[in-house]
């Protein structure tokens, strides 16, 4: 885990409200933008967002490789946004595939998204519920010194739990910004993340390059500091959380 756990070591516990009843002194937020690599215009707009935005790029998109290089050059953290069942396509993981084929697809996807520091799942409500496949995945990510973000597209996911078992650098998404694609709803979800960060010490947000989402983020992200939020890179967030589950995802720091 030392490979990626840098920068926020001074904030060893971001969730004292879940352990000792005290209000957290710090409130951290991290943001991931998913589904990138499809549109140069949307990609460029996501890249231009202020602060340490993590860019999750889909391998089966026409601009995946070029945008990954561009994002890395700009100093952004790049992630592979790995398609998983019910997602389809040549890279998608499905429960009926043997581990050898899953490995082949992971290798091919990583080649399409150079500089990926970690992965998160695209869709995957069925695939992330498969313990054998997730156990293999987290072991492989650990071997490659990559981290995992469990997008938690299903309550049945075991991805983060399997990562925690072996000590893989990982964390889970807390808030989806844009399940409802209106500016009002997206702004509301952003404020939900702010409140959650103040309550438990940290919040991980995932959004998409929809015009409505990007417009809200362009307007609101610069205001986070005034709301008492410290906006940090996803790798710093892994360090802050120390691989512990939040109350919504587990008990006493252990994923359920």
Predicted features, each with a name:
Residues 7-256:
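Catalytic-site microenvironment of enzymes
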Residues 1-7:
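Bacterial N-terminal signal peptides
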């Amino acid at each position: 885990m030392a490979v990626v756990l840098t920068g926020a070591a001074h904030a060893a516990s971001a969730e004292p409200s879940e352990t000792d009843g005290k209000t957290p002194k710090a409130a951290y937020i991290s943001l991931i933008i998913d589904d990138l690599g499809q549109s140069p215009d949307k990609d460029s707009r996501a890249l231009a967002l202020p602060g340490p935005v993590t860019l999750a790029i889909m391998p089966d998109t026409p601009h995946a490789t070029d945008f990954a290089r561009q994002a890395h050059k700009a100093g952004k953290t790049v992630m592979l946004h790995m398609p998983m069942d019910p997602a389809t396509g040549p890279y998608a993981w499905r429960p009926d595939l043997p581990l050898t084929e899953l490995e082949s697809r992971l290798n091919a996807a990583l080649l399409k998204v150079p500089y990926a520091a970690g992965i998160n799942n695209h869709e995957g409500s069925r695939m992330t519920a498969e313990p054998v496949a997730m156990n293999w995945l987290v072991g492989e990510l650990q071997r490659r010194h990559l981290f995992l973000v469990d997008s938690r597209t299903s309550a049945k996911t075991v991805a983060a739990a399997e990562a925690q078992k072996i000590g893989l650098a990982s964390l889970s998404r807390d808030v989806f910004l844009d399940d409802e694609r209106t500016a009002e709803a997206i702004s509301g979800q952003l404020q939900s993340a702010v409140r959650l960060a103040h309550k438990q010490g940290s919040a991980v947000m995932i959004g998409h390059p929809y015009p409505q989402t990007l417009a809200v983020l362009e307007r609101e992200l610069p205001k986070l500091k005034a709301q008492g939020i410290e906006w940090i890179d996803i790798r710093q967030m892994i360090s802050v959380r120390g691989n512990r589950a939040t109350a919504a995802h587990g008990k006493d720091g252990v994923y359920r």
